[in-house]
Amino acid sequence: MVMAEKKRSKRYQKRRTIVEQGKTYSLPDAVNFLKQIKDTRYDETATVDFQLGIRPDQNDEMDRGTVALPHGTGKKIRVICFCKGEGARAAEAAGADVVGAEDLVQKIQGGWMEFDAVVANPDMMREVSKLGKILGPKGLMPSPKSGTVTPDVARAVKELKAGRIEFKSDKTGGLHAPCGKLSFPKEALEENARTLIRAVKDAKPAAARGNYLKNVTLSLSQGPGVKLAVSSL
């Protein structure tokens, strides 16, 4: 295990030396560059990493929102849905992997966690709230703000399956979100990244002042990143 860590570190450092320190890239050039240094052993995920000009200790300066990436994330998203009756049938038709009510709550309380996103009808939230300590720390608790607590569960399921993601700034003022796989055509990866960047800019808190996008980096999940020219975004 230690040897594997060393090998990964050497590969990372080798790729990192190729990145010119202090250089900024346009988004198209950044996508092209990362494709040139990609690890051919597996399909890496590209992420956009932001350092925002916010005061992260102020709740009214938190940047949070959702965005539907036009070309998806490249990852199969397992979606579960808490609903009953007609809503349950609609969620199943929309592609939900598991649909349930009290039985699904009990299943998760028993340790089952084979899912990536959660949708709930508002009338199920009394039951779903019992899972707060389980889902909350993992960022899986559904909420109206993220569009995952809604009467239109079918639409929410479809959007999540199609590549809608949630983003949220952290306690350091950073924000990190995936924008696709390096195997995507460069145009698709660029469009996804632009869509994500635009969504983060549009979600700028009203209380935030000054330079908002302090740094934006296009990175590899297991490798280095390159700084984007913020003025071009």
Mark where each language-model region is.
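Short flexible coil/turn linkers enriched for glycine and charged/polar residues
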Residues: 73-75, 85, 170-173, 209-212, ...
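Glycine-rich phosphate-binding loops that contact phosphosugars or nucleotide phosphates
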Residues: 90-97
